[in-house]
From Swiss-Prot:
The keyword Zinc does not apply. Residues 1-48 are annotated as: Disordered. One of its GO terms (biological process) is sporulation resulting in formation of a cellular spore. It comes from the Bacteria. Keywords: Sporulation. This is Small, acid-soluble spore protein N. Belongs to the SspN family. One of its GO terms (cellular component) is endospore-forming forespore. Residues 27-37 have a biased composition (Basic and acidic residues). It is found in: Spore core. It comes from Bacillus velezensis (strain DSM 23117 / BGSC 10A6 / LMG 26770 / FZB42) (Bacillus amyloliquefaciens subsp. plantarum). Coiled coil: none annotated. The lineage of its organism: Bacteria, Bacillati, Bacillota, Bacilli, Bacillales. Induction: Expressed only in the forespore compartment of sporulating cells.
Amino acid sequence: MGINKKDGQPQYAPSHLGTKPVKYKRNKGEKFHDKSNGHPIVMQTKGE
């Protein structure tokens, strides 16, 4: 009865850090890292 079901995680998922697969972190990095351009496109916003 030590598993808290209120946090929304599945029962089999570990709640402490360091046990998730490395591929999960790698995919997140690839999603945000854009290699197509040498420099990012800066969009002018109001007030800058």
